[in-house]
Amino acid sequence: MEQTTRSPILCEAKDYVTGLYDGEGRMLEQTENLPILAFSLAPVCKHIRKTFEGDIHEGDVFFHNDVFSLGNQNNDVAVFKPVFFEGELVAWTAVKGHQADIGGAVAGGYNPNAVEVWQEALRIPAVKIVDRGKLRQDVWNLIFANVRLDIVQHDMKAEMGACAVGERRLLEVLRKYGVASYNVHKQALFEATRR
């Protein structure tokens, strides 16, 4: 993520998190920085699963930032990618990063005169931005027509790329050790957190 993003907010201030979630959206791993961002990802992942139930496919990618559906602030835009192995949804990779602008009445999203959330930034409820590996250009255009800075498009592509790297690395593990071993270790992790 840090090697592909262009914004100093992400690559220098490190105002982002990454995470790995099981097929149900339960947290398996997350970066240590900014727990407020990281801990908001699991509930959003579950929200996306529910919202798109029956319409989640290999190659899909979702965007989300909506404070009314579990987001923490509109400038923190999350990307989720489902991971399929042998036709089964086994995990999700996710990245959430603070974007320099995501629309709204003033540049940067910090509007001290705002009296409602619509004046702060563009609200992005759970939306499928890539459908089965094909970018939904119409949705992309709608979002970024409302954003002042071109750099945000590059940073969102960096978030998408980081999710793809996470997917690729998890699939390497699954091919090497198998889904049964993954499930055993996943369950051991959940049991350890209960103690």
Where are these regions (language model features)?
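Short, basic/aromatic recognition patches
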Residues: M1-A13, R49-E53, F63-L70
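Short, small/polar residue-rich loop motifs at catalytic or cofactor-binding pockets
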Residues: E12-D15, N75-V77
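Anionic-ligand anchoring segments at beta-strand to alpha-helix junctions in alpha/beta enzyme folds, i.e.
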Residues: D15-V44
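Regulatory sensory and allosteric helical modules in signal-transduction proteins
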Residues: R26-Q30, A42-D66
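A short, polar/charged loop-to-alpha-helix boundary motif
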Residues: P35-I48, A100-G109
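A short, hydrophobic, proline-anchored segment that marks a local hinge/packing element in signaling
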Residues: D76-E86, A94
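N-terminal leader/propeptide and maturation segments of large enzyme subunits in energy/redox metabolism
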Residues: R123-R195
